[in-house]
């Protein structure tokens, strides 16, 4: 079994926040792949289904972001999972909006949700880093991540979530390259068609000469006129 964790904060107040893009990612997977209904478990909401041959549990911790590790740890203990079975979807300030990167293990880079997971299960789990951009100053980070995506962000956000759902099966079986390719196909605008070369106008042909119907005697006489 694989455990896909989407980080965010519970409640309608936070639903459209940049900080909740992890929630949005696992919700897109559940909707696109016919997962079961969300139900309360492990201090969060879970939905079960299959991605290819892999049984997958989707988890949205409802502990609020800073205590996400409590929920993740509880689910892992119940199913006897290791960090290698876990992939966490989270917002990433250090990536431009719409960019996506995979990471296995390593530090939490100051992300409070990851910090909590580190404290409960260690750092060896996988992450899908979802770029939301940086507001430019550290004092602006909290209000920025706790604000809704702007209207101008909606198109790339929808494409990103569709790409994540498209590639989820590849991610579950460990094919990170194919997962990223699925996302890239959604994010890249279609290339404009090359204009077809204009058809060449047919060359004008000289009019055919009228056939000479003179008799041999007339032709001879005309030569001496």
Curated annotation (Swiss-Prot):
Region (Disordered), start-end ranges: 182-225
Biased composition (Basic and acidic residues): 211-225
Molecular function per GO: peptidyl-tRNA hydrolase activity; tRNA binding
Marked site: Discriminates between blocked and unblocked aminoacyl-tRNA: 9
Active site (UniProt): 19
Listed InterPro entries: Pept_tRNA_hydro, Pept_tRNA_hydro_CS, Pept_tRNA_hydro_sf
Complexes and interactors: Monomer.
Role: Hydrolyzes ribosome-free peptidyl-tRNAs (with 1 or more amino acids incorporated), which drop off the ribosome during protein synthesis, or as a result of ribosome stalling.
PANTHER family named among the record's database cross-references: PEPTIDYL-TRNA HYDROLASE
Protein name: Peptidyl-tRNA hydrolase
Organism, scientific name: Cereibacter sphaeroides (strain ATCC 17029 / ATH 2.4.9) (Rhodobacter sphaeroides)
Encoding gene, per UniProt annotation: pth
